[in-house]
Swiss-Prot record:
Organism: Trichormus variabilis (strain ATCC 29413 / PCC 7937) (Anabaena variabilis)
Sequence intervals crossing the membrane: 34-54, 93-113, 130-150, 195-215, 216-236
Annotated gene: atpB
Molecular-function GO terms, alphabetical: proton-transporting ATP synthase activity, rotational mechanism
Subunit annotation: F-type ATPases have 2 components, CF(1) - the catalytic core - and CF(0) - the membrane proton channel. CF(1) has five subunits: alpha(3), beta(3), gamma(1), delta(1), epsilon(1). CF(0) has four main subunits: a, b, b' and c.
Upper classification of the organism: Bacteria, Bacillati, Cyanobacteriota, Cyanophyceae, Nostocales
Cross-referenced InterPro entries: ATP_syn_F0_a_bact/chloroplast, ATP_synth_F0_asu, ATP_synth_F0_asu_AS, F0_ATP_A_sf
Name under which the protein is recorded: ATP synthase subunit a
């Protein structure tokens, strides 16, 4: 009973999953292993980009061919969700989200982070840490605020009182709950996948975990696609001109 009460006396901010390697910078306490694996993912993406663009060929092959397919896929995704007139400036943002999440998710399954020993905690996919996914969600929020404001100016905030003024608090809450729901879904899926595979490897270390790992790779790719698609959809929604559409319908 005392242990139960002691658990609930712990502040929520101190609750955490597993142990962490902390870096103390002034009054800030950072999760060091998240920075290490994030830098690894960024390094992989930078090296792949340099390798693909260092010797560009008219008929692409190898890494150049792979990244050109990825770019076409991201362009189509952004065009479908944002619209043909507005999508081009947002391709880098949507592409960065998709590629970072995709490589982060797959790194947790394919890279043997567990073999690298740290003073505390252990390395894992960046997206298995709630700090990473919430940061991505907040970037998404800032992106569609900027998209709506740059397209409509102060008129963007008129959407918050449409169709009736008492919708204002609900619209404000919705702006933050949409990307945050994405962040918790991404965090939960990647963390659960790593935990399940880790337990199976301990119990049956040979071939049984392989189908689960393959399923984890598939769901990891789907989670990256969902996050990027909905981020693009939110940006497109913020720039959507309802008045212009109504005017065209009357004509």
């Amino acid at each position: 009973m005392l242990n139960f009460l002691n658990f609930y006396s712990v502040p929520l901010a101190e609750l955490e999953v597993g142990k962490h390697l902390y870096w103390q910078i002034g009054n800030l306490k950072l999760h060091g292993q998240v920075f290490l694996t994030s830098w690894f993912v960024i390094g992989v993406l930078v090296l792949a980009s340099v390798a693909a663009s260092s010797n560009v060929k008219r008929i692409p092959s190898g890494i150049q061919n792979l990244l050109e397919y990825a770019l076409e896929f991201i362009r189509d995704l952004a065009k479908n969700q944002i619209g043909e007139k507005e999508y081009r400036p947002w391709v880098p943002f949507v592409g960065t989200l998709f590629l970072f999440i995709f490589v982060s998710n797959w790194s947790g399954a394919l890279v043997p982070f567990k073999l690298i020993h740290l003073p505390e905690g252990e390395l894992a996919a960046p997206t298995s840490d709630i700090n990473t996914t919430v940061a991505l969600a907040l970037l998404t929020s800032l992106a569609y605020f900027y998209a709506g404001f740059s397209k409509k100016g102060l008129g963007y905030f008129g959407n918050y009182v449409q169709p009736v003024s008492f919708m204002l608090p609900f619209k404000i809450i919705e702006d933050f709950t949409k990307p945050l729901s994405l962040s918790f879904r991404l965090f939960g899926n990647i963390l659960a996948d790593e935990l399940v595979v880790g337990v199976l490897v301990l119990l049956v270390p040979l071939f049984v975990p392989l189908p689960v790992m393959a399923l984890g790779l598939f769901t990891s790719a789907i989670q990256a696609l969902i996050f990027a698609t909905l981020a693009a959809a939110y940006i497109g929604e913020a720039m959507e001109d309802h008045h212009g559409e109504e005017h065209e319908e009357h004509h």
